[in-house]
Amino acid sequence: MESDPSDDTKRWLLTGDVSIRWQVMRDLLNAPPSQWQPVQAEVGKKGWGARLLKHQDDSGRWTPRLYGKKWISTTYSLVLLRWLGLPPGHPQAVKSCLLFLDEALLDDGGINVTFSYKHSETCVTGMVLALLSWFKINDPRRELLLEFLLNEQMDDGGWNCQRDQGAVHSSFHTTISVLEGLREYVEADGERKQEVRTAESRAREFFLVHHLYRSHRTGEVSNLTFTRFSFPPRWHHDVLRTLDYFRASDAQYDERLEDPIALVLKKRLNDGRWNLQNRHPGKTFFEMEQVGRASRWNTLRALRVLDWWDRVR
């Protein structure tokens, strides 16, 4: 009897880094927490998570500035650790996250890590909200970040880092970073989670109007990089990243998602895997995968998106 290709793909995924294995167990194999949580607990002890933590200094930083030197800065190192699934409450992550509240919190309630202008940076504020929520840092200042983001939501439902400079149309990039922060806040049982769900719904509609990657006026592809799946996505939007958010939020079926789902299916290889299609230029401590080669990260995310899609259709 021939083996099921999907089973072969899952076995291949399980031979990857521990950061992938625990998510495969949770999201694709539907294993109980008693099985995948011990695997997740290893993320900071071996593999990519441990390698990244070794570059952190005693102050909790990866670089002197919180944001400079993409992608080895403290900001993007923490964002990657969240993607890897470093467990909530990890002391090294908690120490680093608090630096943003102690050193980069402005009077407007948001985070500014560049100080090149006086207004807080919406995209980074969304990232930091996600970090504080994922790592279960219940500092009361977290609510200031949330308030800032809710106040920055634009009329079309999304967000744009340049709103204070006159932008009137939301940014795909900023919106997905904020949405991930709001989602982590809800998952962390934040006290304003009902209000946050309403904001999420408005922002999902912004993406749906655009089919996640098209102009709402012409229907043409807004940016070809939106159709090329990267990991880590850094601050960039692409179709797979944002579909994975829709999955994580357990969004309802909407026919406007048929288009981006078809794009994901089109990119599946004959062996049931997905390639790494894009890498955002910048310095890294190490590379996890190679562009043009089969990607466990993209395969994991695509499969769990498709599982969600099959469930809600």
Please describe what each predicted stretch is.
Residues 1-313:
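Preference for long, amphipathic alpha-helical scaffolds in soluble/luminal domains
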